UniProtKB/Swiss-Prot annotation:
PANTHER family: DNA TOPOISOMERASE 1, PROKARYOTIC DNA TOPOISOMERASE
Domain Topo IA-type catalytic: 162-571
Catalytic site positions: 320
NCBIfam families documented for this protein: topA_arch
Functional summary from the UniProt entry: Releases the supercoiling and torsional tension of DNA, which is introduced during the DNA replication and transcription, by transiently cleaving and rejoining one strand of the DNA duplex. Introduces a single-strand break via transesterification at a target site in duplex DNA. The scissile phosphodiester is attacked by the catalytic tyrosine of the enzyme, resulting in the formation of a DNA-(5'-phosphotyrosyl)-enzyme intermediate and the expulsion of a 3'-OH DNA strand. The free DNA strand then undergoes passage around the unbroken strand, thus removing DNA supercoils.
Record GO terms (molecular function): DNA binding; DNA topoisomerase type I (single strand cut, ATP-independent) activity; zinc ion binding
Subunit structure of this chain's protein: Monomer.
Sites marked Interaction with DNA: 59, 172, 176, 322, 505
E.C. no: 5.6.2.1
Biological source species: Methanothermobacter thermautotrophicus (strain ATCC 29096 / DSM 1053 / JCM 10044 / NBRC 100330 / Delta H)
SUPFAM superfamilies according to UniProt: Prokaryotic type I DNA topoisomerase, Zinc beta-ribbon
Reaction it catalyzes: ATP-independent breakage of single-stranded DNA, followed by passage and rejoining
Region (Disordered): 361-380
Name of the protein in question: DNA topoisomerase 1
Amino acid sequence: MRSLSGKMHEVIICEKPKSSEKIAGALFPDAMKKKHGKVSYWEHVEGDKRVTIVSAVGHLYSLRPRQSNEEHFFDLEWAPIHEIDKKKGYVKDYLNVIRKFAAGADRYIHACDYDIEGTLIGFNALKYGCGEEALRKTSRMKFSTLTREEIQRAYKNPIEVDYGQVDSGAARHILDFIFGVNISRSLMKSVKAATNRFIKLSAGRVQTPTLAILVEREKEIRDFKPVPYWIIRAELGEGIIAESKRGKIFKRELVDSILEKCQGSDAEVKDVRVRDTIRKPPVPFDLGTLQSEAYRVFGFSPKKTQTIAQNLYTEGYTSYPRTSSQKLPESIGYEKILKNLAKNPRFGVHIERLRGPLKPHEGKKEDDAHPAIHPTGLLPSELSKDEKKVYDLIVHRFISVFGEDAILQTMKVELEIGEEEFSFSRKRVSKAGWMESYPYTKMEDEEFPEISGGDSLAVRSVSADERETKPPARYNEASLIRELERRGLGTKSTRADIIAKLYDRKYIEGKKIRVSPLGENIIDTLTRYCEKIISEELTRQFERELEDIMRGKISKDRVIDEAITEVRSILSDIEENLRDIGKELYRAYQDSRVVGECPACGGKLVIKYSPRNRSTFVGCSSYPDCRTVYSLPRGASVLKSLCEKCGLPMISYGRPRQRACLDPKCGKKKSEVEEVVGKCPECGSDLIKRSGRYGEFVGCKGFPKCRFTCSVDEVPEG
């Protein structure tokens, strides 16, 4: 059926405005950019065909209960997101453009990102924005980069919409809603029943088991009892330090016996072995390994890395980031990408070293939808400092996977001192290979001493180095993402958001993650009364079933029915212990609000909320007997550090974050509060200890002109 103009009307729907601009420019360079209100769209007319390119802005629709007055919400519907979340009012303008200019077309092309979320975004926009009829006229573009060539190829070779992706995506949203919303409401109801107070609490299908993992580690660290041990070390000539082959020695008497036995003896060289070890090139980045590497190299949070990688993809500089693949198929065009990258001398010097046929060293992980993360060959014209860091990391990784093996040489020397066996080793790179193209790896280059079997070496001293066993290491964001992946919790796209939510809820804090008392008490309470909420196995089961929905092995409705049954069981457990749960949660919440001691009466200073003023403040727990009160600036955080002048807690506030005393009358000026910890390696200004969402960090005083930051533990020397 033709439109009223007599021309066949085709609509291309994209996920985001920037993507729609890229796709319009690649397919129809002379397309006319138009505006309806604040929203842009594109039109192209050629012969008897009219094409309209419109954009979503992420999800246009979200879930809500059909009846908002029910006790529990299991009957849900999709509704425009701006009707549910008032902060999303801007979405209405995009939806209006789709309804006005896309409805009633002859043909639709779904051109959102090719993943579960992208497929669901486009499906809902078409179904609810253009009507059910639109779905029968829809085909799908599949692309992994927003380059002109790939967009044109995807347009000329459309595929069918993957309804397995649609159902899996919809089921995930429904499961997250019925778990998260119902259980969170039930927990808040328990507090209301026990104390007649309202506090905001949050639980989630993946969020709560993740918090439980962190609580388990917190308890392991707290319960750990360090045990002393000794390492016997011998100092020889030429800066050589050899260690006893006994390793850790836990008995002091044995240590004394060994030291006495070694006294006055030379070191006899028993064996010298030099061997070569091949170190293969790294594998291409999937999202998880990119996040881990960016955290290791730059200290970037996984969420920050994911956001930057998405921006680089949208600009057309790198491929789609939310991939599990460590494979680089030949079809991406290795030679063309490398040839274009070589136009930048910084990359060209490394590309020139590549020898022989181009064959990437690939990893085991695969993804049906997208290849590993790689540069497209399009050189950026302008990037922010952090975008440049991530882009360079991706490019160097891509080049290095085609590199030659590196060869590491290891020297192992075994010695005997007074009949006690010692050894030492040295390492050096004999062939750099791929390591020359990947500057983020450490190239060891230790000097090998000229020693042969039978030599006798003078011993300068033999001593015992006393140490203690250490507790398990705290998770950081990168290691937690790896742990969640190992345990099968969450997805590549959601894990960073889950961790960010735990920070936002104040359940965890710090780069080396610590669980707050509130976070720990929530898990302890849930473990006692309704352990199923924190069950990893239940979460894994639903992750497997969501995957099975996508592959057509199980129906969406069956999985949703299973989830409703499980949630009803959890809600029943909470209801049976409603007041006990509420009392414990409220006690934990109250403890988490204590920030110090009242200087007037010795009571507790507590963070409070004023409904009348809609603001938080710090007041004494002994109110009304004690009326000590301190206002808090909007968005302020109370820190653990204390004011050197009056002993009250410090606060951080403003953009960029400033630190000051809780008491504005203290007289502690901002300039006095700033703690200089070094010099910025990029601009030479002072480095200042600051406070932010993840706790304390170090930033350049030259902000915003210089945006250098690092953790408190990584302050550059000099």
